[in-house]
Structure formats: structure tokens, C-alpha cells
Amino acid sequence: MYAVIQTGGKQYRVQPGDKVKVESLDAEAGQEVAFEKVLLIQSDDGVKIGQPFVSGGKVTGTVVAHGRHPKIRIIKFRRRKHHMKQAGHRQNYTEVQINEISA
């Protein structure tokens, strides 16, 4: 059984027991979170595809930790002008352990 959920502007394919790094959520470590925006659920009964979301579909999980992704470097050059601009960015994330998928 698996599902496709939408959170933080991205889509994730999840199964019970998976650990997923999603965009930062307002939840403490150990707290349960529910994802209501379920796009697809595949189970033994068949596939349920939402238009856009599966009605009654829900994925629950537990927040494991909060963290930050590795730094990415942004560099802009102006050719032949001896000009360079550097910046860096680290995106926050929340790691979630998927517990249950229900339709």
C-alpha cells in the first residue's frame, strides 16, 4: 500500500514505515501530523485517484526531527568585469515517520 501526498508545494510517494523529509511544519518532535491532501492511494482493493484529492483520504505520521539541508552556493558572474556575487542558502525541513494510510 502506498499513497501520494501533497505538502509544502511538493508531492511525495509514501508507504507506512517510511521516513520522509518534507518542507518545515509547525509541529514539535513526537507530535502527530495528518496530511489531508492525498492525490492517490494504491491498496489491495485497487487504485483511488483524486480529482484533485481523494475524498476521505488521510495519511498520518509522527514528527521525528527538524533539521536543515546542506548549504547550496549561488554565484553570479559578470563576464570580463571582475565582478562576482556569492550567496548561500540552507532550507529547513521536518522529518516525518509515516504511520498509517486510510481511505
From Swiss-Prot:
Keywords: Ribonucleoprotein, Ribosomal protein, RNA-binding, rRNA-binding. One of its GO terms (molecular function) is rRNA binding. GO terms for biological process: translation. It holds the Pfam family Ribosomal_L21p. It comes from the Bacteria. Transmembrane segments: none annotated. Part of the 50S ribosomal subunit. Contacts protein L20. Belongs to the bacterial ribosomal protein bL21 family. NCBIfam families: L21. This is Large ribosomal subunit protein bL21. It comes from Methylococcus capsulatus (strain ATCC 33009 / NCIMB 11132 / Bath).
